A protein has these predicted regions:
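Bacterial carbohydrate/catabolite-sensing allosteric modules
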Residues: 1-179
């Protein structure tokens, strides 16, 4: 597609979340979410994978909870983690809604977040700060993304012959109760 593109930066803060978990003793860190759902989920999975490989903690790769194409995702997620022989001690999730579904499934299985298992989401949705426990998440700066999108559009209108641009906006890890 010949067009300007705007994305949020998915990699750095996922890697920072994994580093935070490792620094606090977590060794079996897994990913939850359908990596094939969209490009952002795939980038987040790859950032997670690179981070755990960097720390030599590849055990978590064998227990990723990635049901795909499911109509009832919460049930599929529950069924996936219920079958784990060894439960991870932390999860990085594709977004906050996956993280909240995961916390509910873990609670149903008798695990406590964060006492037994840590969970980190992505998007810093409004629901993440109200959810119990308050969800650690990676904040997307929506206002900056909106401004940047408008700027890209206005520049394209004024200078249609410019090379197409790909712009990434910054994200930030927000630590809350779930880690």
């Amino acid at each position: 597609l010949k067009a300007d593109r705007l994305y949020m930066e998915n990699r750095i803060e996922i890697q920072n979340a994994v580093a935070h978990m490792v620094q606090r003793g977590k060794k079996h860190i897994s990913f939850a979410g359908d990596k094939n759902h969209c490009q952002s989920f795939f980038e987040r999975y790859m950032a997670y994978k690179d981070a755990v490989e960097h720390f030599g903690l590849t055990e978590g790769l064998s227990t990723c909870a990635m049901p795909s194409g499911q109509q009832n995702y919460p049930v599929s997620l529950y069924e996936t983690i219920r079958r784990f022989k060894t439960m991870p001690d932390a999860f990085v999730c594709a977004n906050d809604f996956v993280a909240m579904d995961l916390v509910k499934a873990l609670n149903e299985l008798g695990y406590s977040v964060p006492d037994d298992i840590w969970v980190c989401g992505f998007d810093d949705s409004q629901e993440a700060s109200y959810f119990a426990p308050h969800l650690t998440s990676i904040h997307i700066h929506g206002q900056i993304m909106g401004y940047t999108a408008a700027n890209l559009l206005m520049t394209r209108i004024e200078e249609p012959s410019l090379n197409y641009r790909t712009v990434y906006t910054e994200t930030n890890l927000i630590l809350r109760e779930s880690t």
